[in-house]
């Protein structure tokens, strides 16, 4: 596919004079273009929903969510994956990010790494990919060889595949099971897909991981009840979450949090039901980790 035929590589007619504008006017142009991004993502919600349902289903079966991309796309996948353990209390293996060129490419551009299909395949092979996993290929253009190679290999293995691109009719679309293609239009600076395309990709990734984790019971109301309290900030957050969920006395909250080794979910259930730790844990296990379901079971029992 020729670059000049890609929407993401087009020249934006609204920013032709951006090099001659005042600082404020220049920034207004950028901001006006950024406003188009959430609208483009909104149009893709039906496809994002399909992906979330598949991801949640596979994670429940013990599978993994693996993001793979090059450059900005790869970094965004790693960013999203790295936030899942502290936010949702999951094993770091559950959601992973892979970038063309390896870890050094997270901090420094390794431009030629994206040009080899075999490298994408090899990087996924190292992960012992299986049919229980979901591979999300991220490429603004939808044509990055490294990502396409990875997706083709994922299909061979029987893993479910999702593509994220900002070009609607890309090579990627022909490969994946679910295509997510928010069309954000040409960039403010021609071809600089770290801008609108990158923002769109980040919004989609937010939805994929957050949506899947909600469906796994990692959220109660809108509270992150599986947060790992590994530092002072997160310990304070854990206390606040329990307070918001239960409205209990702060001394009671602190006491039970310490008893449960700062297990927020268990603490909430113990306070709301009056059960001891063993009984609350048993109830939570029967509810597959869903607080709302556990409360319903307890209510029906009484």
From Swiss-Prot:
Catalyzed reactions: N-acetyl-D-muramate 6-phosphate + H2O = N-acetyl-D-glucosamine 6-phosphate + (R)-lactate
Pathway: Amino-sugar metabolism; N-acetylmuramate degradation
Keyword Lyase set for record: yes
Keyword Translocase tagged: no
Domain of life: Bacteria
Segments forming domain SIS: 55-218
Signal peptide: none
GO terms (BP aspect): amino sugar catabolic process; N-acetylmuramic acid catabolic process; peptidoglycan turnover
UniProt keyword annotations, A-Z: Carbohydrate metabolism, Lyase
Gene Ontology MF terms: carbohydrate derivative binding; carbon-oxygen lyase activity; ether hydrolase activity
EC numbers for this chain: 4.2.1.126
Active site residues according to the UniProt entry: 83, 114
PROSITE patterns recorded: GCKR (PS01272), SIS (PS51464)
UniProt miscellaneous comment: A lyase-type mechanism (elimination/hydration) is suggested for the cleavage of the lactyl ether bond of MurNAc 6-phosphate, with the formation of an alpha,beta-unsaturated aldehyde intermediate with (E)-stereochemistry, followed by the syn addition of water to give product.
Function: Specifically catalyzes the cleavage of the D-lactyl ether substituent of MurNAc 6-phosphate, producing GlcNAc 6-phosphate and D-lactate.
Alphabetical list of HAMAP family matching this protein: MurQ
Similarity comment text for this entry: Belongs to the GCKR-like family. MurNAc-6-P etherase subfamily.
Complex and partners: Homodimer.
Name used for this protein in its record: N-acetylmuramic acid 6-phosphate etherase
Lineage of origin: Bacteria, Bacillati, Bacillota, Clostridia, Thermoanaerobacterales
């Amino acid at each position: 596919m020729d670059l000049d035929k890609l929407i993401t590589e087009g020249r934006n007619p609204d920013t032709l004079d951006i090099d001659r504008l005042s600082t404020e006017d220049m920034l207004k142009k950028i901001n006006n273009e950024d406003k188009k991004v959430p609208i483009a993502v909104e149009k893709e919600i039906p496809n994002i929903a399909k992906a979330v349902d598949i991801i949640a289903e596979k994670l429940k079966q013990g599978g993994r969510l693996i993001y793979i991309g090059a450059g900005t796309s790869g970094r965004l996948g790693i960013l999203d994956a790295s936030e899942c353990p502290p936010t949702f209390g999951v094993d770091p293996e559950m959601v992973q990010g892979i970038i063309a060129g390896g870890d050094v490419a997270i901090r420094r551009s390794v431009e030629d790494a994206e040009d080899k299909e075999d490298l994408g395949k090899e990087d996924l092979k190292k992960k012992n990919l299986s049919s229980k996993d979901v591979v999300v290929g991220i490429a603004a253009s939808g044509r990055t060889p490294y990502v396409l190679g990875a997706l083709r290999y994922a299909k061979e293995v029987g893993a479910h595949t999702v593509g994220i691109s900002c070009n609607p009719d890309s090579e990627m679309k022909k490969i994946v099971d679910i295509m997510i293609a928010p069309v954000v239009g040409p960039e403010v600076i021609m071809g600089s897909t770290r801008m609108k395309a990158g923002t769109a990709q980040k919004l989609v990734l937010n939805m994929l991981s957050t949506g899947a984790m909600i469906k796994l019971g990692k959220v109660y109301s809108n509270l992150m009840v599986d947060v790992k309290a590994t530092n002072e900030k997160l310990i304070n957050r854990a206390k606040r979450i329990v307070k918001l969920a239960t409205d209990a006395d702060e001394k009671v909250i602190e006491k039970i949090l310490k008893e449960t080794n700062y297990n927020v979910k268990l603490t909430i259930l113990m306070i709301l039901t009056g059960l001891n730790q063993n009984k609350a844990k048993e109830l939570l296990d029967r509810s597959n980790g869903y607080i709302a379901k556990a409360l319903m079971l307890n209510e029906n029992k009484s």
